[in-house]
């Protein structure tokens, strides 16, 4: 194509060309001149050969994966003669495959690595608690009664005396002060709740506590004999009288009002006896 276009060129254009264009090529150049048209560049045998070799390399690589045996010598020689472009492509594919495998292993947690390649920080192991002996606890409690805070000299003395370290003594006193603070807060809360109940509620609580103690001491109150008459019938509005009730000024027993608990107990015993007398027993013939 270039020769025909040059033949058809006008004679004026031939005159405009410089005399350097008519010079022959140098004698020492053995390589032929390469035409710069698109068709000539695409039709170069070296490019075709590189593409064909690249395709053959891919085919041989696929056959190597599926075939049980190794490649023949001819195939290996063909792979060794591939172009640098094919070698670069093969290297990149292997690199990406390796990255995919490492990411999958990290996701599965095989080697303890995260996806970003950072090792998971191990959990901080909790220190074991020091087991104090009874003698050590007794000495520490005795010292804590009159000294809540220790000086460095006292701390060293106690640690040497009980066979403990300074850190153990410091930790024990810190925990003991915290426990004392919690106990005081609980006591304050109990006092506040008792104040809210009022005097009647406090008397009821005291009476219930004394009744529980008496029932535990007497072993259940005589077994509740008489078919349930051992339980006194309480009337509404009659306050319970504690055991340490006040006596009369003369030293004799205190005169109880008709609504007192003792009169209620006597009345309940009479009611129980009347119920027992009036109770009928059915006997089968």
From Swiss-Prot:
Residues 218-230 have a biased composition (Gly residues). The keyword Cytoplasm does not apply. Residues 125-184 bind DNA. One of its GO terms (biological process) is regulation of transcription by RNA polymerase II. Pfam families: Homeodomain. It comes from the Eukaryota. One of its GO terms (molecular function) is DNA-binding transcription factor activity, RNA polymerase II-specific. Residues 272-285 have a biased composition (Acidic residues). Residues 1-36, 212-285 are annotated as: Disordered. It is found in: Nucleus. Residues 1-20 have a biased composition (Basic and acidic residues). Keywords: Developmental protein, Differentiation, DNA-binding, Homeobox, Myogenesis, Neurogenesis, Nucleus, Transcription, Transcription regulation. SMART domains: HOX (SM00389). One of its GO terms (cellular component) is transcription regulator complex. This is Transcription factor LBX1. It comes from Rattus norvegicus.
